[in-house]
Swiss-Prot record:
It is a multi-pass membrane protein. It comes from Clostridium botulinum (strain Hall / ATCC 3502 / NCTC 13319 / Type A). This is Putative manganese efflux pump MntP 1. InterPro entries: Mntp/YtaF, Put_MntP. GO terms for cellular component: plasma membrane. Pfam families: Mntp. Probably functions as a manganese efflux pump. It is found in: Cell membrane. The chain crosses the membrane at residues 6-26, 36-56, 64-84, 100-120, 130-150, 158-178. One of its GO terms (biological process) is intracellular manganese ion homeostasis. Keywords: Cell membrane, Ion transport, Manganese, Membrane, Transmembrane, Transmembrane helix, Transport. One of its GO terms (molecular function) is manganese ion transmembrane transporter activity.
Length: 183
C-alpha cells in the first residue's frame, strides 16, 4: 500500500473521531487534561484496532464486517442521549470526566479501524509493515483529534453554542450514530 493511500485511509477513519472530539471539546465541563486523554485514547485505539484487524483479518473478515458499524453507532447514540440528559442537569462534573468514557468512546470511534484492518491491512504480510501502517493510522487520528480540540475551543467562544453545547453535541452524536447504523 502506498503512503498516499494509507494517509487517505487514515484520514477517512479519523473523521469519526474528529466529529466526536468536537462535541466533547465544546462541552462546558471538559478540561484540557481530559480532552488530551480523549485525543490519545482515540489515537491509540485507531492504532490498536487497525493492527488487530490486520493481524487476524483473513480469519474473521466475513463474520465481523457488519457488526462493528452497528455496535459503534449504538454506542455513539447512547453517548448523545447521555449528553442531552446531562444538559438538563445542573451539576459540576461532566459525563466526559468519567474515566470509563475514555475507553468507551475510544473504542466506539475506532471500530471502523478494526474493519479497515480486516479488509485492507490484512494484505500486508510483513508484521513490521503492518505495525508501522497501524501506527501511522493512530498518529494521523491523534493529529486530527488534536486539531478538533483546538477548533472546539474557538467554537466554544460563540455564546449560543456555549449555552447549548450539551444539546448540540448530543444531537450531532445521535445523528452521527444513526448515520453509522443506516447509511
Amino acid at each position: 500500500m502506498e503512503v498516499q493511500e494509507l494517509f487517505l485511509l487514515a484520514l477517512a477513519i479519523s473523521l469519526d473521531a474528529f466529529g466526536v472530539i468536537l462535541c466533547i471539546g465544546i462541552n462546558k465541563g471538559i478540561t484540557l487534561k481530559s480532552s488530551m486523554i480523549f485525543v490519545f485514547s482515540f489515537g491509540f485505539f485507531q492504532f490498536f484496532l487497525s493492527f488487530l484487524g490486520g493481524y487476524i483479518g483473513t480469519i474473521f473478515n466475513k463474520y465481523i464486517v457488519p457488526i462493528p458499524t452497528i455496535v459503534g453507532g449504538l454506542i455513539i447514540i447512547i453517548v448523545g442521549i447521555l449528553m442531552i440528559t446531562e444538559g438538563f442537569k445542573e451539576k459540576e462534573e461532566s459525563i466526559f470526566l468519567n474515566k470509563i468514557m475514555y475507553l468507551i468512546l475510544g473504542v466506539s470511534v475506532s471500530i471502523d479501524a478494526l474493519v479497515i484492518g480486516f479488509t485492507t491491512l490484512s494484505y500486508i504480510n510483513n508484521l513490521f509493515y503492518l505495525f508501522m501502517s497501524s501506527l501511522f493510522m493512530g498518529l494521523i487520528a491523534t493529529i486530527i483529534c488534536s486539531l478538533g480540540i483546538i477548533l472546539s475551543k474557538y467554537i466554544k467562544k460563540i455564546s449560543i453554542i456555549s449555552s447549548y453545547a450539551d444539546y448540540i453535541g448530543g444531537i450531532i452524536l445521535i445523528l452521527f450514530g444513526l448515520k453509522m447504523l443506516f447509511f
